Structure formats: C-alpha cells, structure tokens
C-alpha cells in the first residue's frame, strides 16, 4: 500500500530562504519514504510518499517540524 500526502504552505515572506534551507534534507535516502519539495511563487509544496502508516507518520512529523522551525527562524530574523 502506498500512502501519499501533499501540503501547501503559503509563505508571505522568506519563501526562497525557507525552501533553500530545507533542500539538504532531500539528500538523505530512506527505505520506506520518498519526499519532494518545490516552490511555486510564494507557496512551498511538500509531497511525501510512504509504504506504510508508521513511516508516513514519522516522515510527516520530521518535515512539519522542520518547516515550522524554518518559518520561526525566518520571522525572528526580521526582528
């Protein structure tokens, strides 16, 4: 069974910085998950494909945490 998830993050500012900060995470290869990340204008689009629910949950926890931290760091930089 293949499980697919797609998330769109509309980012007002810093979209390019956030996108580029997350790109190195795609270099790591995993046996049961595959991820893609793209930037369309100011929207970050994350696609995750997993072989099972446990793998999907783990991958999403990691990716969502990374996106959240990147957004927080970008907003702190503006202060």
Label for each model-derived stretch:
Residues 1-11:
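Short glycine-/aliphatic-rich beta-strand segments at the starts of folded cytosolic domains
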Residues 6-7, 40-46, 71-74:
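Low-complexity, flexible helical/coil segments
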Residues 13-28:
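Short amphipathic alpha-helix segments
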Residues 19-22, 32-33, 59-62, 71:
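Surface-exposed beta-strand edges and their flanking turn/coil or helix-capping segments
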Residues 22-24, 37, 65-66:
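Hydrophobic alpha-helical segments
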Residues 29-59:
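Amphipathic, hydrophobic secondary-structure cores in small proteins
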Residues 53-79:
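C-terminal structural segments of small proteins and small subunits
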């Amino acid at each position: 069974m293949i499980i697919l998830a797609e998330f769109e993050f509309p980012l007002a500012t810093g979209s390019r910085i956030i996108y580029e900060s997350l790109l190195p995470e795609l270099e790591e290869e995993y046996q049961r998950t595959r991820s893609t990340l793209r930037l369309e204008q100011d929207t970050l689009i994350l696609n995750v494909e997993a072989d099972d629910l446990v793998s999907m949950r783990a991958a999403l926890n990691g990716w969502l945490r990374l996106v959240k931290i990147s957004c927080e760091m970008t907003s702190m930089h503006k202060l």
